[in-house]
Curated annotation (Swiss-Prot):
Span list, region Disordered: 1-49, 364-427, 619-657, 737-765
Classification via SMART domains: PolyA (SM00517), RRM (SM00360)
Family affiliation: Belongs to the polyadenylate-binding protein type-1 family.
GO-annotated cellular components: cytoplasmic stress granule; nucleus
PROSITE patterns: PABC (PS51309), RRM (PS50102)
Keywords: Cytoplasm, mRNA processing, mRNA transport, Nucleus, Repeat, RNA-binding, Translation regulation, Transport
Protein's name in the database: Polyadenylate-binding protein, cytoplasmic and nuclear
NCBIfam families membership: PABP-1234
InterPro entries according to UniProt: Nucleotide-bd_a/b_plait_sf (IPR012677), PABP-dom (IPR036053), PABP_1234 (IPR006515), PABP_HYD_C (IPR002004), PABP_RRM1 (IPR034364), RBD_domain_sf (IPR035979), RRM2_I_PABPs (IPR045305), RRM_dom (IPR000504)
Organism: Aspergillus oryzae (strain ATCC 42149 / RIB 40)
Superkingdom, taxonomy of origin: Eukaryota
Source organism phylogeny: Eukaryota, Fungi, Dikarya, Ascomycota, Pezizomycotina
Length: 765
């Protein structure tokens, strides 16, 4: 006969509902409190052969239990109860014997046996929950010494009758909570134990023993106690008040059963105490009259004495209410700002966001631990050096004042003092963490600030501005994004395994003289192709995915007479293909050869197609023939890559035409996604002339500016040079902070590898 996990005796759940013991010194006789009963069958009912084994280590298995319990007799079955989802052990099991006699012997001999270093607790299994929760014969013991464990408690109470279950409540670390339960087979045995043990000393501690009271009954009785309290708590008591004076303050309200002041180990008053009255009316009168009454320059607090768990519950409710109120108050008005430079402080942050509304608070988060890296001797040396420098400056200034008439030095000294004081203030603060918070007075102001300040360049770094979110909200959003990403990966894996996948817009390469469009690294703005363009190969190239061989293809996949190309597909114009198509130059396989080669021995351009891919220029590319930007490792003239035509026609310099002919009218006429592309193509050759290695990086940084500013930079060479220098300084500082190797000339660490990674990602997209 096997038992389910649902037959867990209530003793396991008892710990969660156990009340806190009263720590009030002046409290009356303690209440009889206990937890859910763990009743077993009565003496008149025959025992089954099923045993409950509790207090097990999570690593205990059925095999370990079988090895132990089979020594008593023949075991029918053993089951360790586990969580339905995680399959982790719940810490208890059921052992079924073939006969009841073996079960009785196991209960007597194996109870509290060490299994994996923990004493197990064995009792008869009771499948009927009604019998488990009657509470008959269940005894609650509190104020136990921490040294008393399950076995010691069992040995103490075994003299009064047959014990079905015995347990000392423990915390998560295995330490005693100071109370426990003993479940007798009969109610007479329980009454006998209460009569003899209640009030006795166990390990020099007076214990309370009483009948088990269910949680429901305890709750109703607790509400009744709150309404008819007699114990009063007083705080803010002057330390000079004696026990006699304290008692005299409250004697006028009625008969006092006990009054005490709490004191520390040295005997000094801790400023609070308890007074227990004989009647509720006296206690209520004391609270009404003495609360907030001034005694010896201190206002007393007088109220009903509360138990620890009751105070904790009230504090938790207050904290939760305050948290919800705060969350609703700042909903939609608190902004999170990151990517701040180290020199931005609270005042500067307020200045940045001040134009967009009324700021109630602005805070830059800083490290709280300020480590001093200098010894006191080095500090003194530094002070001496600064003093000598100041003396030298003063002497030089005095000499200059004698020779020429200058402005009074007072104003300069005041400015220096102000600067020094500001520096001293900043030294007292920790290092900026690079992010902060700005709180506005209304949601409209906050949304306006997000719109205007997000991605705004401040001190060479683009700000990230968004509405502040709670940690749990951010975590849930992150989990959702990770789950979506995993779903995409699974779909990609399924597609790679041969499952059909939807048609996607391929990358677009334009012929000579046409405005170029670069798809983004993770996807671009797709628009209908135009005459003269070439399409990159459709991913996959499997049969049925729009194969499109050219005439003369050999070995390529053919296209049936009824097959059609996708509606947005246009092949290479035959006029652009001069000469025969090479073997295997079908679509999509042959189209891969249209792209530039990846190395000195890679594929070159298709014969007869001069300057193919001129539109593919932009940040991250080097300079190739005819002014066309070339990726790192791309073929250059004379490298002799396979498929390159030696008699290729010379290419013009379309960049100069774009830069010279780009006007505000032409820019505004273009679609918004294409405007930055046009500006980037016009800026790139100018920036490359100044910084060949970092032209792509700097172009991308400058494209964060407004379009009107970029147009003015195209016309003003000096302004462009200044912006390039500024971007270069920002990039150098970024590389230093990142730990990369950056030289004073502005060369980035390993630019070739960065360019190679960029090129591979773009071609993947």
């Amino acid at each position: 006969m096997s038992a389910d996990a649902s037959t867990t005796p209530a003793a396991d759940s008892n710990v969660t509902s156990t009340p806190e013991t009263s720590t009030t010194p002046a409290a009356p006789a303690p209440e009889v409190t206990a937890v859910e009963s763990t009743t077993a069958p009565n003496a008149s009912q025959p025992h089954s052969a099923s045993l409950y084994v509790g207090e097990l280590d999570p690593s205990v298995t059925e095999a370990m239990l079988y090895e132990l319990f089979s020594s008593i007799g023949q075991v029918a079955s053993i089951r360790v109860c586990r969580d339905a989802v995680t399959r982790r052990s719940l810490g208890y099991a059921y052992v079924n014997y073939n006969n009841t006699a073996d079960g009785e012997r196991a209960l007597e001999d194996l109870n509290y046996t060490l299994i994996k270093g923990k004493p197990c607790r064995i009792m008869w299994s009771q499948r009927d929950p009604a019998l488990r929760k009657t509470g008959q014969g269940n005894v609650f013991i509190k104020n136990l010494d921490s040294a008393i464990d399950n076995k010691a408690l069992h040995d103490t109470f075994a003299a009064f009758g047959n014990i079905l279950s015995c347990k000392v409540a423990q915390d998560e670390f295995g330490n005693s909570k100071g109370y426990g339960f003993v479940h007798y087979e009969t109610a007479e045995a329980a009454n006998n134990a209460i009569k003899h043990v209640n009030g006795m000393l166990l390990n020099d501690k007076k214990v309370f023993v009483g009948h088990h009271i269910s949680k429901k009954d305890r709750q109703s009785k607790f509400e009744e106690m709150k309404a008819n309290f007699t114990n009063v708590y007083i705080k803010n008591i002057d330390q000079d008040v004696t026990e006699e004076e304290f008692r005299e303050l409250f004697e006028k309200f009625g008969e006092i059963t006990s009054a005490t002041l709490s004191r520390d180990q040295e005997g000094k008053s801790r400023g609070f105490g308890f007074v227990n009255f004989s009647t509720h009316e006296s206690a209520q009168a004391a609270v009404d009259e003495m609360n907030e009454k001034e005694i010896r320059t201190q206002k007393l607090y007088v109220g009903r004495a509360q138990k620890k768990h009751e105070r904790e519950e009230e504090l938790r409710k207050q904290y939760e209410a305050a948290r919800l109120e705060k969350a609703s108050k700042y909903q939609g008005v608190n902004l999170y700002v990151k990517n701040l430079t180290d020199d931005v402080d609270d005042e500067k942050l307020r200045e940045l966001f001040g134009p967009y509304g009324t700021i109630t608070s602005a805070k830059v988060m800083r490290d709280t631990n300020i480590e001093r890296t200098q010894t006191p001797e080095s500090d003194k040396e530094k002070e001496n050096k600064e003093a000598t420098k100041e003396n030298e400056k003063e002497s030089s200034e005095a000499e200059k004042a004698e020779k020429t008439e200058e402005k009074p030095a007072d104003s300069g000294d005041e400015k220096k003092e102000d600067k020094e004081s500001k520096k001293a203030d900043k030294k007292g603060l920790g290092k900026s963490k690079g992010f902060g918070f700005v709180c506005f007075s209304s949601p409209d102001e906050a949304s306006k600030a997000v719109t205007e300040m997000n991605q705004r360049m401040v001190n060479g770094k683009p700000l990230y501005v968004a509405l502040a979110q709670r940690k749990d909200v951010r975590r849930s959003q992150l989990e959702a994004s990770i789950q979506a990403r995993n779903t995409i990966r699974q779909q990609q894996a399924a597609a790679a395994a041969g499952m059909p996948q939807p048609y996607m817009q391929p990358a677009v390469f334009y012929g000579p003289g046409q405005q170029g469009f670069i798809p983004g690294q993770r996807g671009g703005i797709a628009f209908p192709p135009q005459p003269g363009m070439v399409m990159a190969g459709i991913p996959g190239g499997r049969p049925g995915q729009y194969p499109g061989p050219f005439p003369g293809q050999q070995g390529g996949r053919g296209m049936g007479p009824n097959q059609q190309l996708p509606p947005n597909f246009q092949g290479i114009p035959m006029g652009a293909m001069q000469g025969p198509v090479p073997n295997g130059m079908g679509y999509p396989q042959g189209m891969a050869q249209v792209q530039f080669g990846r190395g000195a021995g890679g594929r070159g351009q298709v014969p007869g197609m001069p300057n193919m891919g001129q539109g593919m220029r932009g940040p991250g590319y080097g300079q190739g023939r005819g002014g066309v930007p070339v990726q790192q490792g791309q073929m250059r003239p004379g490298q002799g890559g396979r498929g390159q035509n030696a008699a290729q026609a010379p290419a013009g310099r379309p960049e100069e035409a774009v830069a010279g002919g780009l006007t505000a009218q032409a820019l505004s006429a273009a679609p918004p996604p294409q405007q930055k592309q046009m500006l980037g193509e016009a800026l790139y050759p100018k920036i490359q002339a100044q910084q060949p290695e970092l032209a792509g990086k700097i172009t991308g940084m400058l494209l964060e500016m407004e379009n009107t500013e970029l147009l003015s930079l195209l016309e003003d060479e000096e302004a462009l040079r200044a912006k390039v220098d500024e971007a270069l300084n920002v990039y150098d500082e970024y590389m230093k902070n990142k730990g990369g190797e950056s030289e004073a000339t502005g060369e980035a660490a390993k630019p070739k590898e960065a360019a190679k990674e960029t090129s591979t990602e773009e071609n993947k997209s």
